[in-house]
């Protein structure tokens, strides 16, 4: 079992456990150059809010600072944006789904920024 398969197995188990809780899920996906965050409905079929480093406003803000979005500063910005969008959609608390990625670096920065912006998990 290679690294990718192990990550996907961990992600699958996490999603099964979150589905049993019947709460909204904040899912994070990370690539070398970008980071994505989505809030799914409790049933898991609808995306209620999303934010990523591919959005025009985010790219414009990151162009002033550094790089495209593969860094902690970009992850912090996405964490704040997803929390704002989730609260606007009426979601106060979520279950955090790190998609098998380690809670470290960009994933941790996104989670902490979302918490600071008022999202509870």
Swiss-Prot record:
**Tell me, which GO biological process terms does this entry list?**
translation
In terms of superkingdom, the source organism counts as Bacteria
State what this protein does: This is one of the proteins that bind and probably mediate the attachment of the 5S RNA into the large ribosomal subunit, where it forms part of the central protuberance.
**Entry keywords, A to Z:** Ribonucleoprotein, Ribosomal protein, RNA-binding, rRNA-binding
Q: Which family does it belong to?
A: Belongs to the universal ribosomal protein uL18 family.
State any GO CC term.
cytosolic large ribosomal subunit
Look up and give the organism this protein is from: Burkholderia multivorans (strain ATCC 17616 / 249)
Assembly? Part of the 50S ribosomal subunit; part of the 5S rRNA/L5/L18/L25 subcomplex. Contacts the 5S and 23S rRNAs.
SUPFAM superfamilies referenced in this protein's UniProt entry, alphabetically: Translational machinery components
Query: Would you tell me the protein name for this molecule?
Result: Large ribosomal subunit protein uL18
Stored CDD domains: Ribosomal_L18_L5e
InterPro entries, sorted: Ribosomal_uL18_bac-type, Ribosomal_uL18_bac/euk
GO terms (molecular function) for this protein are:
5S rRNA binding; structural constituent of ribosome
- PANTHER family tied to this protein: 39S RIBOSOMAL PROTEIN L18, MITOCHONDRIAL (PTHR12899), LARGE RIBOSOMAL SUBUNIT PROTEIN UL18M (PTHR12899:SF3)
């Amino acid at each position: 079992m290679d690294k990718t398969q192990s990550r996907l197995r961990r992600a699958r188990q996490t999603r099964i456990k979150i589905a049993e809780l019947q709460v909204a899920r904040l899912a994070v996906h990370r690539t070398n150059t970008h980071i994505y965050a989505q809030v799914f409905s409790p049933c898991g079929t609808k995306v209620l809010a999303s934010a990523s480093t591919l959005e025009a406003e985010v790219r414009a803000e990151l162009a002033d600072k550094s790089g495209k979005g593969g860094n902690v500063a970009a992850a912090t910005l996405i964490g704040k944006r997803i929390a704002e969008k989730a609260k606007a959609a009426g979601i106060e608390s979520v279950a955090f789904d790190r998609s098998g990625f380690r809670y470290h670096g960009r994933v941790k920065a996104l989670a902490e920024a979302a918490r600071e912006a008022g999202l509870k998990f």
